[in-house]
Amino acid sequence: MKVFYHNDLDGRCAGALVAYFTGNYSPEDYFEVDYVMDLSVVPVADGEIVYFVDYSFKENTLDFLKSLQERGCQICWIDHHTSSINLCNAHPELQSIAGIRDADASGALLTFKYFSPYGDAPDFVKYVSDYDCWKFQYEPQTTFFKLGIETVKYDALDEIWTRLLGEMWTSEIGYLIVTGRTIKGYVDKTNDYYREHFAYESEIAGHKCLVVNQKTNSWVFGSKYGEYPL
């Protein structure tokens, strides 16, 4: 068995779910990948089971997928990116590949649904999907969990996932959320100070905007975010 998973929180969570449901925790079978890596360097045997989770194939990488099909590999492809869905529409022969291609949920949540179609996904999987798809239906827990889990090792086979999937999951997820809440509080206070001292108004194409010269994300705008059209 080989498992290819995307190198972000969603992909790592998806990879962890493959390990949990298949019972295969062999590190030599798991490969964290991005979109510039050459997947063909990974040795895959003819007829082998191959999982791609939270991974988007495109026209220039399609040959690898087709080569696995031709070699009789049992492929499971789970992804939520629009590029994957468009690729399947453009190549009907890909529709027969097992898995789920659906833009309504993240790769991790789709992976859970694939293995447990009638089960209710754990809260942490919902938080991962909520953040990755930018839906934020479970805020503030979504952001707190994301920040909290980034304080520990969270690769696909790291212990954090087995703890989150274990009997003590409530205390584990609670600890991560509390940790994330503390981090977010610090970030917000730091952003407030920086914005209050260094932000200034300007215009872009005639539209009033607030400018903050800092390498950061939109959190730096705080409550000002909704006061400007840009």
What does each model-identified segment do?
Residues Y138-H197:
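Accessory alpha-helical/coil subdomains and C-terminal extensions
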